[in-house]
Amino acid sequence: MAKKRIVIALGHNALGTNLPEQKAAIGPTAQIIADFIQTGWQVAVVHSNAPQVGMIHTAMNELCQNHPEEGYTPAPMSVCSAMSQGYIGYDLQNGIRSALLKRGIYKSVSTILTQVTADPYDESFYHPVKKVGRVMTAEEARLQEARGNHVAEIPGKGFQRIVSAPKPVAIVEIDAIRALLDADQIVISCGGGGIPVLEQGLDL
């Protein structure tokens, strides 16, 4: 008889907004996930990454600003999202694995770096609204706009970068995710809804 499958979604701020908060949140979260696995469920875990992407984006920008002599360039939002999927998955993998081993359960836990295709005509590309990164001064906002980035004013606070959040059309790595679930492994994927990509011939 096939096992029941469940998707556990860790929503906005469920893993905190910085590294210590994430570490603290992983423990009880992993225990809940282990409860489902122990009772016979196959589990796929998805998670938000908005605070983490903002933190990485800010850090990469400040690295460029503080060390111009090194020739660093700002990291695209897609790269920041990929980095966040990696380190969130790393913490979740280890937390879930530990929770299972303490119960005598031996299962592989894997993170899939996940991309999702998007419609090039999605409204979000033309009218971005998702806020990321720290609040900026007016001068910093002007510099961001000069680089081609979109910025919105936050009343009473300052300015913040805004990015597109298109609706996913398809998961690029869906076959890998299904293969791992079919092998009775725990899968962590679709961090932040997946990294939006556009199909351009054979390239993404």
Mark where each language-model region is:
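N-terminal glycine-/serine-/threonine-rich phosphate-binding loop
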Residues: 1-46, 55-67, 179-184
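Active-site-proximal beta-strand/loop segments in catalytic clefts of secreted hydrolases
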Residues: 10-11, 49, 114-116, 191
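Short, basic, glycine/proline-bearing loop/turn elements
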Residues: 13-20, 156-164, 199-204
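Short, active-site-adjacent cap segments at secondary-structure transitions
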Residues: 14-16, 50-54, 118-121, 195-197
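Conserved mixed alpha/beta catalytic, RNA-binding, or beta-rich assembly cores of soluble enzyme
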Residues: 14-16, 171, 186-204
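Short Gly/Thr/Asp-enriched flexible loops that form oxyanion-binding sites at enzyme active sites
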Residues: 55-61, 93, 199-201
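Ligand-binding beta-strand-loop-alpha-helix segment within the catalytic cores
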Residues: 63-187
